[in-house]
Amino acid sequence: MGCGCSSHLEDDWMENIDVCENCHYPIVPLDGKATLLFRNGSEVRDPLVRYEGSNPPASPLQDNLVIALHSYEPSHDGDLGFEKGEHLRILEQNGEWWKAQSLTTGQEGFVPFNFVAKANSLEPEPWFFKNLSRKDAERQLLAPGNTHGSFLIRESESTAGSFSLSVRDFDQNQGEVVKHYKIRNLDNGGFYISPRITFSGLHELVRHYTNASDGLCTRLSRPCQTQKPQKPWWEDEWEVPRETLKLVERLGAGQFGEVWMGYYNEHTKVAVKSLKQGSMSPDAFLAEANLMKQLQHKRLVRLYAVVTEEPIYIITEYMENGSLVDFLKTPSGIKLTINKLLDMAAQIVEGMAFLEERNYIHRDLRAANILVSDTLSCKIADFGLARLIEDNEYTAREGAKFPIKWTAPEAINYGTFTIKSDVWSFGILMTEIVTHGRIPYPGMTNPEVIQNLERGYRMPRPDNCPEELYKLMMQCWRERPDDRPTFDYLRSVLEDFFTATEGQYQPQP
């Protein structure tokens, strides 16, 4: 037993349990429960929480308490539904589904990790974005739904315990831009952007700059808008029965088969790739799919589940805007500025740098195999599938389906696919991006492309392609694979292509 010394007790009740002689706080009996007797004679069992060891919890808000950022409707046996703003206690934190108990209903079940945030932290604030890079802050703020003055506060990438403010603004020359301000720490725990005015906390800082710009580029209008996150896939559902899938809309046909928008178990929107019968060995596919599902990154299309009997189905996350090559030709795609186009290239190269780090080769990198979300986020699809195809029209270089125009010379001539042949393909993909989906080597047949490459020919610089970007393409097309850059290098160049010569943060106002 122990005392949880507090400054005072409420004086409208009297207890019929032992109290501490020093502070008169109730001492928890051995059964961990106490009976409180109110002056009106009613009795209630007090849910005093027992704790291990001799010391009480340091904070009244325990670390395992979370608040729901969004409402969630249960859709599996064992998951727990909740309303936005509801408090839950996390019982087990493992993987993407956490076991929790609702403090409202007392019920227990599994909850999606990305629908909740720690209650005793900044995470529930709509303007706070945890683990967000400067570049991703720009992408979020420039996405549809945000306007002039939209803002967010994020953790500093370089200094632990520090923060940055990112604000959407309008520039006469550049159009919609995002400006960044360092939020500096005071020795006493406060914060400031300008030394002229300091704040005890970030909430006070946000309130001040919401009322007036006071030296910032603009007044803060509203927190950055984000969509409800996609719930994680239920972990036990990998090889699924075909009847659990309902194919709704045929989105297109590719080298491997048809792609459909559909629903899994009537409630989860997914993309379903139906592979042509005989196009690959089911056993080889399942072995590769088991490897592919371990490759999880925000720039890779997430593989959810498979149907392993022919025709093979691959179930992945659904991307609303379809393939990049098609999206670039739409009215929305045609309007994209060179800045946004290069940002798409930077997103793709980020995913390829991840595959490079994992020693994984794509083998078929082109705009047709990049998918685009409704917020213009780009993700790489079909990584690894190309080597499983058993169709001679695809595997032989003379075949009608072989993607000659995207393939490195050593892969065309000798079948040598490496991460460096992927780098060559990425150079071709960049031409697709800056030309809004134009087929590479316009006017040339596949045999003509092969002959010209053997003579050292390279595509000329496309119209509206920055000179520095074309130099990067030419590096990707170097004859010797080892002379081509790494994806990690390409990522570092493309992420800051237009900001390398500018200050990344605004001066103090």
UniProtKB/Swiss-Prot annotation:
It is a lipid-anchor. The modification Phosphoserine is found at residues 102, 162, 194. One of its GO terms (biological process) is positive regulation of intrinsic apoptotic signaling pathway. Residues 61-121 form the SH3 domain. Residues 154-242 are annotated as: Interaction with PTPRH. A lipid is attached at residue 2 (N-myristoyl glycine). There is a cross-link at residues 99, 276 (Glycyl lysine isopeptide (Lys-Gly) (interchain with G-Cter in ubiquitin)). The modification Phosphotyrosine is found at residues 192, 394, 505. Its main location: membrane. GO terms for molecular function: ATP binding; non-membrane spanning protein tyrosine kinase activity; protein serine/threonine phosphatase activity; protein tyrosine kinase activity; SH2 domain binding. The keyword Nucleotide-binding applies. Non-receptor tyrosine-protein kinase that plays an essential role in the selection and maturation of developing T-cells in the thymus and in the function of mature T-cells. Plays a key role in T-cell antigen receptor (TCR)-linked signal transduction pathways. Constitutively associated with the cytoplasmic portions of the CD4 and CD8 surface receptors. Binds to the cytoplasmic domain of cell surface receptors, such as AXL, CD2, CD4, CD5, CD8, CD44, CD45 and CD122. Also binds to effector molecules, such as PI4K, VAV1, RASA1, FYB1 and to other protein kinases including CDK1, RAF1, ZAP70 and SYK. Binds to phosphatidylinositol 3'-kinase (PI3K) from T-lymphocytes through its SH3 domain and to the tyrosine phosphorylated form of KHDRBS1/p70 through its SH2 domain. Interacts with SQSTM1. Interacts with phosphorylated LIME1. Interacts with CBLB and PTPRH. Interacts with RUNX3. The SH2 domain mediates interaction with SQSTM1. Interaction is regulated by Ser-59 phosphorylation. This is Proto-oncogene tyrosine-protein kinase LCK. It comes from Saimiri sciureus (Common squirrel monkey). The lineage of its organism: Eukaryota, Metazoa, Chordata, Craniata, Vertebrata.
